[in-house]
C-alpha cells in the first residue's frame, strides 16, 4: 500500500480537487467462435448430459479427499503479508487522505485526518480538511440510470500474429481490441471526465436481503462508468496468436502479464487490461471512484487468469485435445502450485480494486441452456473457480444472452430464482444502448456495450460519447471487419 501511495502522490498534486434512457436494441452475442470451444469442454452436445454426470461422479468423492491437498481450500496469506501490514501502519496520513480525496472519498479523507492524535494542532491537516469539505460541497448525485457499462475481451498485443489469416483471425477482428486502441479509448474517456465505478456503488444489499439504490457523488464534469472484461483465462486456443499468456505478481508486488515472444522467450509487462488500467490509475488516480477498477467475468473450463486450475488438469479425465497437449508439453505441471499462484494473483488484484464475476464455468448461453445444465455448471464454478477468485454476487452472461426480457425478472422465472438462490444479485447482459440499468428491491441489472472491432467499424456513431473511432482505430486491423 505504501508503494501505491508513493506512486500516485506526484499525480495527485497535478489534479484539481475542484472541479431519460435510450431505447433497447436486441441483445447481441459475444464471441460466437467461443461457442464450439466451450461446448467441447464438456464433449459434444448429444452426450453432454451423460458426460457431465460421469465427470461429477468421477470427481465428487476425490474433490472432498483432495481439495485441501490441491490448495483450493487453503488460506491465501502470502509470505510478505505481515510486511505489507506493517508498511500500511507507517503510511503518511496526509498522503493517504490526498489519495482518498482525489478518488472522491472526501468523507474518508476527512475522517482519517480528524482521527489523527495531532489534528487539533496540525494546521496542514486542518487546511486539507477544509479543502476537502469545500470540494465535497460541489458534488452532485449522478443519475444511476444514466451510467454506461463498457467491456472488452483479451487485448491484442501483436496484430501480426492475431490477424495472420488463420481460422481465428476473423473472430479476433470482430470481437477483440488492440492494446493501442485500448490505450487511446481509455485516454479519451479520461479526458471527457469518465470515472470507474462498480455496480456495488450503484446498488447495495441491505441486512434484510433487500436491495437499495446506491449514491454516487461526483464533482461537476465527472461521469461514472462501469468497466469489465470477459474471459480472462488466456484460453489454449489463443496460444501463439499475439495475446498475453497469464497474469503474474512481479517482484514489486504488482500484477503484470507474461507474454511469450516468437522466439519462445517470456516478457513481463502491461499486455492486457488489468496492468494497463493499474498503470493508468497510478498516473491518473482520479480515474477511479473510491479505488474502483473493473470487473473480470470468468469461466473455469480452461482455468483462470492463465493458470490451469480446473480439476480436469489434476484428474486427467475428460480432457480436450489442447488440454492434453498442454499437460504433455509440461510434464512437471504441479496442480497445487498452479492453484496457489492463481490465488496470489487474484488476491493482489482484489487489493487493487478489481472484482470478479461468474461468466458461467463453461461459457454457457443461459438463454438456450436448460435449468438443470445451468445448475450443474454453476456447481462447477463454485467448486473450482470460487475457491481461487473468491465468492461473488455478480454474474455477467456469456454470448450477451440473458435469462429474461428487457422488462425485468419475475418470481416465476426459474433461472432467475435459481441464480438468486445461489447468491447472485447483480446481472449483466450485452446491449448496445448507451445505458440500460434496472434497480429493484431484488436485483441490479445492467447492459454492457462492446468496444471492439465490429462495433467500431460498423457503428462508430454509437461510441461518440466515449471516443472518436477515427482517432483510436488501429491501422494494422484488417478491413473490412467481417460482418455477423
Annotated model-derived regions:
Residues 93, 182, 341-342, 412:
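Amphipathic coiled-coil/heptad-repeat helices and related helical stalk/stem segments
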Residues 145-165, 209-211, 218-225, 233-403:
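Metal-dependent polysaccharide deacetylase catalytic core of the NodB/CE4 family, i.e.
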Residues 2-31:
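Sec-dependent N-terminal signal peptides of Gram-positive bacterial secreted proteins and lipoproteins
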Residues 26-138:
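N-terminal, intrinsically disordered, polar/charged segments of Gram-positive cell-envelope systems
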Residues 101, 107-199, 214-219, 223-227, ...:
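C-terminal active-site subregion of NodB/CE4 polysaccharide deacetylases
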Amino acid at each position: 500500500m505504501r508503494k501505491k501511495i508513493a506512486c500516485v502522490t506526484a499525480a495527485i498534486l497535478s489534479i484539481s480537487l475542484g472541479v431519460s434512457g435510450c431505447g433497447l436494441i436486441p441483445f447481441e452475442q459475444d464471441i460466437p467462435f467461443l461457442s464450439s470451444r466451450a461446448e467441447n469442454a464438456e464433449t459434444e452436445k448429444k452426450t453432454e448430459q451423460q458426460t457431465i454426470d460421469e465427470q461429477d461422479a468421477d470427481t465428487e468423492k476425490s474433490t472432498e479427499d483432495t481439495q485441501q491437498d490441491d490448495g483450493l481450500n487453503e488460506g491465501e496469506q502470502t509470505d510478505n503479508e505481515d510486511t505489507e501490514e506493517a508498511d500500511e501502519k507507517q503510511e503518511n496520513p496526509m498522503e493517504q487522505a490526498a489519495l482518498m480525496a482525489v478518488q472522491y472519498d472526501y468523507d474518508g479523507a476527512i475522517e482519517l485526518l480528524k482521527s489523527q492524535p495531532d489534528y487539533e494542532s496540525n494546521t496542514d491537516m486542518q487546511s486539507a480538511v477544509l479543502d476537502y469539505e469545500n470540494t465535497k460541497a460541489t458534488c452532485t448525485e449522478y443519475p444511476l440510470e444514466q451510467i454506461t457499462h463498457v467491456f472488452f475481451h483479451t487485448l491484442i498485443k501483436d496484430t501480426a500474429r492475431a490477424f495472420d489469416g488463420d481460422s481465428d483471425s476473423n473472430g479476433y477482428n470482430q470481437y477483440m481490441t488492440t492494446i493501442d486502441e485500448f490505450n487511446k479509448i481509455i485516454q479519451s474517456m479520461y479526458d471527457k471526465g469518465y470515472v470507474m465505478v462498480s455496480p456495488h456503488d450503484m446498488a447495495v444489499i441491505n441486512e434484510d436481503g433487500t436491495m437499495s439504490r446506491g449514491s454516487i457523488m461526483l464533482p461537476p464534469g465527472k461521469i461514472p462508468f462501469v468497466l469489465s472484461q470477459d474471459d480472462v483465462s488466456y484460453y489454449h486456443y489463443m496460444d501463439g496468436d499475439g495475446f498475453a499468456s497469464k497474469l503474474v505478481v512481479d517482484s514489486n508486488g504488482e500484477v503484470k502479464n507474461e507474454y511469450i515472444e516468437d522466439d519462445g522467450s517470456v516478457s513481463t509487462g502491461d499486455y492486457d487490461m488489468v496492468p494497463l488500467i493499474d498503470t493508468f490509475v497510478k498516473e491518473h488516480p482520479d480515474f477511479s471512484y473510491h479505488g474502483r477498477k473493473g470487473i473480470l467475468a470468468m469461466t473455469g473450463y480452461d482455468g483462470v487468469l492463465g493458470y490451469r486450475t480446473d480439476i480436469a488438469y489434476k484428474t486427467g479425465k475428460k480432457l480436450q485435445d489442447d488440454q492434453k497437449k498442454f499437460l504433455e508439453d509440461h510434464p512437471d505441471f504441479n496442480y497445487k502450485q498452479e492453484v496457489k499462484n492463481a490465488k496470489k494473483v487474484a488476491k493482489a488484484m482484489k487489493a487493487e480494486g478489481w472484482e470478479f464475476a461468474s461468466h458461467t464455468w463453461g461459457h454457457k448461453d443461459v438463454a438456450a441452456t436448460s435449468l438443470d445444465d445451468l445448475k450443474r455448471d454453476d456447481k462447477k464454478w463454485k467448486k473450482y473457480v470460487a475457491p481461487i477468485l473468491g465468492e461473488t454476487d455478480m454474474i455477467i452472461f456469456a454470448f450477451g444472452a440473458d435469462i429474461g426480457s428487457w422488462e425485468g425478472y419475475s418470481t416465476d422465472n426459474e433461472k432467475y430464482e435459481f441464480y438468486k438462490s445461489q447468491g447472485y444479485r447483480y446481472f449483466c447482459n450485452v446491449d448496445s444502448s448507451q445505458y440500460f440499468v434496472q434497480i429493484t428491491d431484488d436485483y441490479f441489472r445492467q447492459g454492457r456495450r462492446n468496444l471492439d472491432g465490429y462495433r467500431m467499424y460498423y457503428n462508430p456513431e454509437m461510441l461518440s460519447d466515449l471516443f472518436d473511432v477515427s482517432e483510436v482505430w488501429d491501422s494494422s486491423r484488417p478491413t473490412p471487419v467481417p460482418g455477423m
